[in-house]
Amino acid sequence: MKRLLCIALCLILLGTMGCTSGEKNKTEEETMHSEYPIATITMKDGGVIKLELYPKIAPESVKNFISLANSKFYDGLIFHRVISGFMIQGGCPKGNGTGGPGYNIKGEFSANGVDNSLSHERGVISMARAMAYDSAGSQFFICHADSQFLDGQYAAFGKVIEGMDVVDAIASVKTNSQDKPLQDQVIDSIRVDTFGVEYGEPEKL
């Protein structure tokens, strides 16, 4: 009897969902995608990586990434440093790890006095920097494997939600002694959908 009641209840729920499936799916999609900005990295070879960004965890890093991406700063740049089992790094306008946007932003991690709860797990995106804590600019890296030893030292600010196979493919390419791919891994574009939310510009140092 209880089993039949459960089945009947399920059918009623399914019927209700079916009547409003279009509206419900749209609502779920809007809820799922509007909570965080969504970044789309499109590679020259057609590969696509999608990431959600976390402005509550690292607001300056997220503002900076959105500003650079949507101003087409990253278009045509490469992943210049690739270490399989560790990370892939891009965002340098010089293509060799020495370039940036002409300014720096605050390093949002605990060693620099900023609470950041996002651990450097596989798929997490974080800001690359030089030795100085507040030296991040445009360069970023995506963890190819769990790298929690970076926690507290680098500003993690988002995570891959689609396209880890593309990250894996980039991480698997042959590199030279400086970890630069022998064949350029070109970023065609990076764009961030903020779903109408204005995040503003980062504080530039």
Regions inferred by a protein language model and the residue ranges of each:
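Cyclophilin-like peptidyl-prolyl cis-trans isomerases
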Residues: A8-L9, L13, G18-L205
